[in-house]
Amino acid sequence: MATLIRLFIHPVKSMRGIGLTHALADVSGLAFDRIFMITEPDGTFITARQFPQMVRFTPSPVHDGLHLTAPDGSSAYVRFADFATQDAPTEVWGTHFTARIAPDAINKWLSGFFSREVQLRWVGPQMTRRVKRHNTVPLSFADGYPYLLANEASLRDLQQRCPASVKMEQFRPNLVVSGASAWEEDRWKVIRIGDVVFDVVKPCSRCIFTTVSPEKGQKHPAGEPLKTLQSFRTAQDNGDVDFGQNLIARNSGVIRVGDEVEILATAPAKIYGAAAADDTANITQQPDANVDIDWQGQAFRGNNQQVLLEQLENQGIRIPYSCRAGICGSCRVQLLEGEVTPLKKSAMGDDGTILCCSCVPKTALKLAR
């Protein structure tokens, strides 16, 4: 029998999660889950994919707002009533909606921990975002779905294969189950926990975020556990690296640790295997040097040590991305002039394109979309 053994909410997207014994499960997700988010001033979302130290902030939801504790021990408090009353344009993964902006005082405090001006945003009294292809399902600041379920046995199987220590918190689930065999969740289509029925919509594709240590706020130097996942959990139909399942609730109710997870419907699982043959490039460390980078006519001084995606973002240049690990291909751009050091063989395309997340400038560059 499968059982719910852990419950998590993440009140602020990309910050530390909170374990619960019970929670209200609504169609939009668990109460207080990812209802706050850090953004650029223009509303573009910011996550620990870019700023790994975000996972060391501790959010504490209270009845009338949010208390935040930073890694240095300082703290701030904001009430729902203090947020702007006007809706502001906001974006997560290319979906555009509105949210409410926090007061200047807490935004200035938060900006001191980042290399840029940032804002805290709240979903507001009514969520304006919807799940793609599910237009009646409201969504918080979560990546794409209201719920993420993970299986303890699947984590154990991953740990047996992975040379690095792996914690469930690295995958940031809401619901953790035990009593099922490893990867059995791949076959689930409809489940019930307590009185709440969930549709299992799709597997959750994983990214560089899984390599961030929840305690240290640093990415694993060898890219684990994502590297190991790629070796046996790469979907053969689309190349996604999957761990866990995205869910949508059909109704509302309180769910509790210890509740039975009843499997109501199943379907054949996706086929998984290894990623393409060894993609690791031979890398020679370069002496520190500045390089000139031209992005579609916008020139700036960069360096030959940092991946191109991060350098472009530091200049306020928005490059689409998803995994930041050389898997999804979203950040591919045209290399018109110059040389780069690829961190993966697949980062260099035969058509003159490169993956920004997996290339470091070697000489002056000229780039375009």
From Swiss-Prot:
MF terms (GO), sorted A to Z: 2 iron, 2 sulfur cluster binding; catalytic activity; molybdenum ion binding; pyridoxal phosphate binding
Record PROSITE patterns: 2FE2S_FER_1 (PS00197), 2FE2S_FER_2 (PS51085), MOSC (PS51340)
Gene3D superfamilies on file: 3.10.20.30
Residue ranges constituting the MOSC domain according to the UniProt record: 115-264
2Fe-2S ferredoxin-type domain location: 289-369
A biological process term (GO) from this entry: toxin catabolic process
UniProt cross-references to Pfam families, sorted A to Z: Fer2, MOSC, MOSC_N
Protein name, entry field: Uncharacterized protein YcbX
Native organism: Escherichia coli (strain K12)
Higher taxonomy: Bacteria, Pseudomonadati, Pseudomonadota, Gammaproteobacteria, Enterobacterales
